[in-house]
Amino acid sequence: MTDDVPLAAERLHDQLAATAQLPVDRRARRLLGEAEAVAEDMRACEDAVVVERAAVVRDLLAEVEATGDGRADAHLARARALAEDLARPEHR
């Protein structure tokens, strides 16, 4: 793995984990929880696997319209940007 990929994967996980303690609506909570689990798993993966799993996280986060909490929405926006960046094929 290149140095930037593991760091970005860690930051992605941290952004999603930060939503766990916030008052988020039920549907968003389920999707954020799934995305967090995938992000947690991908932290120890090879670059090609990170790209694939980041795409899964990106797709899960795309289904979240709003969280019902402004702080969680900010974490969601940062997580979306990180997942989008990590899902780019040049990270393979």
Language-model-detected regions and their locations in the chain:
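Acidic, polar-rich N-terminal leader regions of halophilic archaeal proteins
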Residues: 1-92
